[in-house]
């Protein structure tokens, strides 16, 4: 039965004869034949055949320097002495005679030659050297003559094979530099990643699963007039699972899957990128229907005319133009689906993003609480854990973590448990792994003085105090004065995963961040460089409030952000006067929050001092210790609110499910109740 969907029918083979295609192995064979012919038809200039009588006469005149007698061939090879060539060759041109001219003589036998030579030595006192050999080995002579050349050719072939080994284009060496480097996965490949291995990303998985479903069952969509998307672009931060999603597509789709990186198109040779694009789509058309996955497409898809090097004829632009033509030009790419991934969609060329090339943009964002729980469930499968490990608890402790970060946490926890000689990975190991990733390696060996420890303790206690007393500050988890990474102390928070952020929330976060510097000034009467990172974060946040969010009193409702990313920092969308006003507003916002931080710390001086002393004594404190000093927080965090709403929803779903189960059970009981006729054995 003929397939309804013509786009999935492979192109029929043309009746035209195939064009002649050059094979590099033919060149190797041609060189070998030429060498053999050169050896067999060796130029005889500089050599001469003599008769036995003439040879005897010349030998007695001491014309020859040395002779070689081949016993089996009854042949003598004699080399003429310098200055004696005229006696042998007459008036022949010197250039044809050569440097060491030779003569060849057919002798009656080796014994007769020996008799002649002995007599000539006795009578004429000749000094010619004579050597006897069994015979002339043609193969050996050939190897001696052309062995070095053959060796060079062999080395050259080996190097060319090595150079072309990574291109996937077979032999050809530098001649295959324009071939695509795509890796091909088909049904014969051993694939391990499926959609079951991709936790979270429900919406993104649905989009790509639809593409796979279309490839498996195209009639379901084509009967309604639908067409498969020509391309899908996966967009999202690093580590969120874009490439993993593509691997799952390769594992699920029963069609060939080409995979390569955007940088594979770029080469030092001009024109190679465009050639590789053409070759990639040629291979894809031959195996259609198929999927082509281009990872990090921003390496080749950057917007034209906006390159930082200001090169008007950039090689990358030529490659992009060819890619645009192949994706949706006059040629037909029926059955070839393009899947690409990038974390810089803002710099991609607009022509690349339009419908007809990438019909779908699938946003792969950082996982939320439920998605992190699912991701932990996947990565905890191969790890031996005890009953203390709870995926939901770990998900709450890792806000803002990507899928790659969560995989790293699980691996670090297993390594920490193995380092400590444990048989199972415990909750404590996971918490240490989170601390290791967020704060860096713990450095208890770093020596600090008593004055430095006091300064660090007051600094961290200032952060903890303000984060506890401010409504919109991130909830505190842990504070330590043990050096980690580059920091001498650190505080861990559970960032609120907000969908929108208000001015008050930003101000509370800035105030809590400035709490360390404010505590140093209030308690110690001096400030240190320990707050440099805090000041950097606060400055960026205040600048964003003024320039991007329009939260300034003197510059309200204005946004100076260029979302296209094409200005390259060469221009500013505001005047010098406005720039000065921006600096003034940023300074004003920071000063207000710094004064606010000092005021709150002054009002809670006793609690701050107790917290700093506990830090000095124990080095590490948790939210329970802060709660013991300041009391329970008066506000509920957004994460806790979401958890409570989710628990209520789960409770309602469970209650509804129980009611449905009871109703089904009641219906079954009514249906199965026997009638009076059935009881007496009659047919109802």
Curated annotation (Swiss-Prot):
What is the free-text note on the cofactor? Binds 1 zinc ion per subunit.
List the active site.
460
**So which stretches are on the Periplasmic side?**
43-138
Q: Which cofactor does it need?
A: Zn(2+)
This protein's GO CC annotations = plasma membrane
Could you say which residues bind ATP here?
236-243
Where does the chain bind Zn(2+)? 459, 463, 534
Location(s), subcellular: Cell inner membrane
What biological function has been recorded for the protein in this entry?
Acts as a processive, ATP-dependent zinc metallopeptidase for both cytoplasmic and membrane proteins. Plays a role in the quality control of integral membrane proteins.
Similarity comment: family membership = In the central section; belongs to the AAA ATPase family.
Quote the protein name from its UniProt record.
ATP-dependent zinc metalloprotease FtsH
Classification from the root reads:
Bacteria, Pseudomonadati, Bacteroidota, Bacteroidia, Bacteroidales
């Amino acid at each position: 039965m003929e397939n309804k969907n013509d786009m999935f029918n492979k192109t029929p083979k043309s009746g035209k004869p195939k064009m002649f295609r050059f094979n590099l192995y033919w060149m190797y064979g041609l060189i070998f034949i030429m060498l053999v012919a050169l050896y067999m038809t060796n130029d005889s200039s500089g050599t001469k055949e003599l008769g036995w009588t003439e040879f005897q006469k010349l030998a007695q005149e001491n014309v020859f320097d040395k002779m070689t007698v081949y016993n089996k061939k009854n042949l003598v090879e004699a080399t003429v002495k310098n200055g004696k060539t005229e006696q042998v060759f007459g008036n022949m041109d010197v250039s044809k005679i050569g440097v060491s001219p030779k003569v060849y003589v057919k002798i009656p036998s080796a014994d007769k030659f020996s008799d002649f030579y002995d007599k000539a030595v006795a009578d004429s006192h000749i000094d010619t050297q004579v050597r006897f050999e069994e015979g002339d080995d043609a193969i050996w002579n050939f190897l001696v003559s052309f062995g070095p050349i053959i060796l060079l050719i062999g080395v050259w072939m080996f190097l060319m094979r090595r150079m072309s080994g990574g291109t996937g284009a077979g032999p050809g060496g530098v001649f295959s530099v324009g071939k695509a480097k795509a890796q091909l996965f088909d049904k014969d490949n051993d694939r391990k990643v499926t959609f079951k291995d991709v936790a979270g990303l429900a919406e993104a998985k649905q989009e790509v699963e639809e593409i796979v479903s279309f490839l498996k069952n195209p009639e379901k969509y084509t009967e309604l007039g639908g067409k498969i998307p020509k391309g899908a672009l996966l967009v999202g931060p690093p580590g969120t699972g874009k490439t993993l999603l593509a691997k799952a597509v390769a594992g699920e789709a029963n069609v060939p899957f080409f995979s390569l990186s955007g940088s594979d198109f770029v080469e030092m040779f001009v024109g190679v990128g465009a050639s590789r694009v053409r070759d990639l789509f040629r291979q894809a058309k031959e195996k259609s229907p198929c999927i082509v996955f281009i990872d990090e497409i921003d390496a080749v898809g950057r917007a034209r005319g906006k390159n930082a090097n200001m090169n008007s004829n950039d090689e990358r632009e030529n490659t992009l133009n060819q890619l645009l033509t192949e994706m949706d030009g006059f040629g037909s790419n029926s059955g070839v689906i393009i899947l690409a991934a990038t974390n810089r969609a803002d710099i991609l060329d607009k022509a690349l993003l339009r419908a007809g090339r990438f019909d779908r943009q699938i946003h792969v964002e950082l996982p939320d609480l439920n998605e992190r729980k699912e991701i932990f469930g996947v990565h905890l499968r191969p790890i031996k854990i005890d009953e203390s490990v709870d995926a939901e608890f770990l998900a709450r402790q890792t806000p803002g973590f990507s899928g790659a970060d969560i995989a790293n946490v699980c691996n670090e926890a297993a390594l920490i448990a193995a380092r400590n000689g444990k048989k199972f990975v415990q909750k404590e190991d996971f918490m240490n792994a989170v601390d290791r990733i967020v704060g860096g390696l713990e450095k208890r060996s770093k020596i600090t003085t008593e004055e430095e420890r006091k300064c660090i303790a007051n600094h961290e206690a200032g952060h903890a105090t303000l984060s506890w007393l401010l409504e919109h500050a991130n909830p505190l988890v842990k504070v330590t004065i043990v050096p980690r990474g580059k920091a001498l102390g650190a505080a861990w928070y559970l960032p609120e995963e907000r969908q929108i952020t208000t001015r008050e929330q930003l101000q509370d976060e800035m105030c809590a961040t400035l709490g360390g510097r404010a505590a140093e000034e209030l308690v110690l009467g001096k400030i240190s460089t320990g707050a440099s990172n805090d000041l950097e974060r606060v400055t960026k946040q205040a600048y964003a409030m003024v320039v991007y969010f329009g939260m300034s009193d003197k510059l309200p409702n204005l946004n100076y952000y260029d979302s296209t990313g094409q200005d390259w920092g060469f221009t500013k969308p505001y005047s010098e006067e406005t720039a000065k006003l921006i600096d003034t507003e940023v300074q004003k916002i920071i000063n207000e929050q710094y004064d606010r931080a000092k005021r709150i710390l002054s009002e809670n001086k006793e609690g701050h001092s107790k917290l700093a002393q506990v830090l000095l004594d124990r080095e590490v404190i948790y939210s329970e210790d802060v709660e013991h000093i300041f009391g329970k927080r008066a506000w509920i965090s957004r994460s806790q609110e979401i958890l409570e709403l989710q628990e209520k929803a789960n409770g309602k779903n469970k209650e509804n499910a129980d009611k449905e189960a009871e109703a089904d059970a009641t219906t079954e009981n009514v249906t199965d109740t026997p009638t009076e006729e059935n009881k007496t054995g009659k047919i109802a």
